[in-house]
From Swiss-Prot:
Family in the record: Belongs to the MnmA/TRMU family.
Intrachain disulfide bonds: C113-C210
Function: Catalyzes the 2-thiolation of uridine at the wobble position (U34) of tRNA, leading to the formation of s(2)U34.
GO molecular function annotation: ATP binding; tRNA binding; tRNA-uridine 2-sulfurtransferase activity
TM spans (from-to): none
EC class (word): transferase
KW Nucleotide-binding (keyword) present: yes
Name of the protein in question: tRNA-specific 2-thiouridylase MnmA
Gene3D superfamilies in the record: Adenine nucleotide alpha hydrolases-like domains, HUPs, Translation factors
Protein localization: Cytoplasm
Main localization (coarse): cytoplasm
Family annotation (PANTHER family): MITOCHONDRIAL TRNA-SPECIFIC 2-THIOURIDYLASE 1 (PTHR11933:SF5), TRNA 5-METHYLAMINOMETHYL-2-THIOURIDYLATE -METHYLTRANSFERASE (PTHR11933)
Region (Interaction with tRNA): 160-162, 322-323
């Protein structure tokens, strides 16, 4: 479907199809449920609880989100189911998150949540318990059927496109999923919600990592991983400060280093250019294009391709090494089934091991993998 509206014939055809919408209590899933109902589908909601907060945890908004999701479903006249995936989330997302930080890498738990929870555990529950034909989410992506396979495309709203977070989906999973708001710009989504009297129309978008909520990242991480303070050094080996733990820092970071006004240095800001895990040293240098911060390419492993085949050896495509980044033109060299070497057309700053590299051919999200090592020269 390439539109948010449906013809009478499409509405009639859709009327026999049951869609389970992941209701988060936000505006995007609210409007997704409304649009699917308008398109004639049998729509029901499913609210996931993925994190078990304790009684003193004032940061997790799960109870408020559930209340908002219920209010929207009541307004739309659809049933809301609830499910607790906290155990699956802990085992498959949170433990991975901690292990990566412990290893000095910078993971993206939202990508792992989509892979293990929203499009695996959720889809299985919708199939086995709720007898779904499709699931639907409020993600800003699109789908297109081509040659018997379903492709995933960037969302219409370039500022909100979330294909970066969904690259681990297979074409089979994409074929079972509907993404109504992917055809819209965000202001239009809010306008529809307000017109339909949905309580979530002006609700603030959620940001950051869901299980951390509004609390400080450093405080949260310290409750699970012991901090190991160490020295901050320049590339020349001069000690210019102390850090509270390498896990609190990422390549390219500028703020929160606690250094500045150094003798014999210019006024350029300091950036993290390396993390020496063996010596527990944070290496910093001045200037956002310092040679230690730049990479000519990278090795990417743990590959996943939406169509299960991926690009050809030597393909010239584009890549994002972080969310909302401009596309980076690149050439791909296949090393083996789970590893590729990627050469950028121009050097790129602050490419970060542990983060995801996601590849595109025009509007089509091809898939991606985890950045393993960097190519410096």
């Amino acid at each position: 479907m390439t539109s948010t509206t449906a013809s009478p014939a499409e509405i009639a055809a859709n009327s026999s199809k049951k869609v389970i919408v992941g209701m988060s209590g936000g505006v995007d899933s609210s409007v997704s449920a409304y649009l699917l109902k308008q398109q004639g589908y049998q729509v029901e909601g499913l609210f996931m609880k993925n994190w078990e907060e304790d009684d003193t945890d004032e940061y997790c908004a799960a109870a408020e989100d559930l209340k908002d999701a219920q209010a929207v479903c009541d307004k739309l006249g659809i049933k809301l189911h609830t499910v607790n995936f906290a155990a699956e989330y802990w085992d498959n997302v949170f433990e991975y998150f901690l292990a990566e930080y412990k290893a000095g890498r910078t993971p993206n738990p939202d990508i792992m949540c989509n892979k293990e929870i929203k499009f695996k555990a959720f889809l299985e529950f919708a199939d086995d318990i709720l007898d779904a034909d499709y699931i639907a989410m409020g993600h800003y992506v699109r789908r297109r059927d081509t040659d018997g396979k379903t492709e995933m495309l960037r969302g219409i709203d370039g500022n909100k496109d979330q294909s970066y977070f969904l690259y681990t989906l297979s074409h089979e999973q994409v074929a079972r999923s509907l993404f109504p708001v992917g055809e819209l710009e965000k202001p239009e989504v809010r306008r529809i919600a307000e017109e339909q009297g949905l309580i979530t129309h002006d609700k603030k978008d959620s940001t950051g990592i869901c299980f951390i909520g509004e609390r400080k990242f450093k405080d949260f991480l310290a409750t699970y991983l012991p901090a190991q303070p160490g020295n901050i050094e320049t590339p020349e080996g001069d000690i210019i400060g102390r850090h509270e733990g390498l896990m609190y820092h990422t390549l390219g970071q500028r703020k929160g280093l606690g250094i500045g006004g150094m003798k014999n240095s210019n006024d350029d800001p300091w950036y993290v250019v390396d993390k020496d895990m063996a010596r527990n040293v944070l290496v910093v240098a001045q200037g956002h294009e310092h040679p230690r911060l730049m990479s000519k390419g990278m090795r990417v492993n743990q590959l996943h391709w939406v169509d299960r085949t991926g690009p050809a050896d030597g393909a010239t495509i584009s890549v994002k090494t972080r969310y909302r980044q401009q596309d980076i033109p690149c050439t791909v060299k296949i090393i083996d089934e789970q590893t590729i070497e990627v050469l950028f057309d121009e050097p790129v700053a602050a490419v970060t091991p542990g983060q995801s590299a996601v590849f595109y051919d025009g509007e089509v999200c091809l898939g991606g993998g985890i950045i393993d090592t960097l190519i410096k020269d």
